[in-house]
Amino acid sequence: MPKAEAGASVTGLSESAYVAPDFLHTFPFDSSKIIFPKGEQKVQIEPECALIFQATWEGTKLTGLKPLCFGASNDCSIRKEGAKKISQKKNWGAASKGLSENLIPVDGFEEGCVLDDYRIASFLVRDGKVYVYGEDSAVRNYSYIYGQLIDWMLEKFNGQKDEGPAEDIHSYL
C-alpha cells in the first residue's frame, strides 16, 4: 500500500488552492504510536474498522468508492472545550490516530465478503493490567455497512453543508 508523505501535495494545485484548515493538511495515522495533544486531558479511544477506498471522480463530483483493504483503527477524539467542529476534536496532528500496519485485502463489499469474518475488540493497558474497553462487535453488524455505507459516504462527501459540527467536506476534496 502506498504511504502518504509529509508535505505531499496534489498535482496541479498550488498551496493557495487548499480551502481546508491548515491542521487538516497533516496525515494523522501511525501504526506504532499515538502522540497525545499537549495540554489536553480528555482523549477518548475509539476502536474502528478502517477501510481504504479507491475514489472515482466525474469532474469535481465523487461518484464511486471501491474498497481495497481494511484494518483496525483507533479514531481517537479529544473532548475539547469550545470545539465547534468534529474535525477540531478528531485531528490534532501527526500520529493522532492509529491504523494497523497489516491491512487486509477486501474480496468484495457485500454480505458474505471477508469482512463478515472480522470483529473489532479493544483493550486498554494501564499499569501493566489489561482492561476490556468497549464492545466486541462484528464488523458486519455496524449500523452502516456495505452499500448503505458507500451511499452515505458519497452523499456526505458531495453534499454535506457547513452547519453545526459538520463541515462542507466537498470543498476540502
Stretch-by-stretch model annotation:
Residues 172-173:
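Conserved catalytic-core subdomain
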Residues 1-169:
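Glycine-enriched loop-and-adjacent helix/strand subsegments that border the catalytic/binding cleft
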